Amino acid sequence: MFKVLSNVVLAPNLHRMMLRAPRIAAARKPGQFVIVRSAEGEERIPLTIGDADPRGGTVTLFIQAIGDSTRKIVEVAEGGYLRDVAGPLGMPTEIEPWGRVACIGGGVGTAVLFPMAKALADAGNEVTTIIGGRSKPYIILADELGEFSHEVRITTEDGSMGRKGFVTAELEEMIADADRRPAAVFAV
């Protein structure tokens, strides 16, 4: 059983859930995931590990509640328990000191991008993060990404936050400018 320490709604149908999972927190690397089951007999769901605190023994998951199984997971309130959390699983993202990098994500993809961007910054890279969404309520983790990104650029399809349009326009401008051109681009 894994205790839910917090469960916060970030955007429509998107939750940030922090769990007590010391073994997973100590072993996880960026790009890995866990398999979560809310209760006995429920479906097993793969979820990206958004963040981990090895000292505190916690992992953070970002969960888009779009089906019955993910809805049952996010219905577990703070203080409640998830039946199973298996992991970390999967091949971690290889992190190198590239220099200047661009990290790009949209909507719930921003949550998947978060651990990769953080690890790239921790490795000494100058990270420009470009995030997008349909509208302002779908822009997530901008402040958190700003804590370690050199720059955070935001786009929304309707122009309600940041630049109107798509993340690709921001990337095209960055690539066209020799002074801002990234050595590597990571997109989810």
Label every PLM stretch briefly.
Residues 1-78:
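Ferredoxin-reductase
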Residues 68-188:
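FNR/FR-type flavoprotein reductase catalytic core
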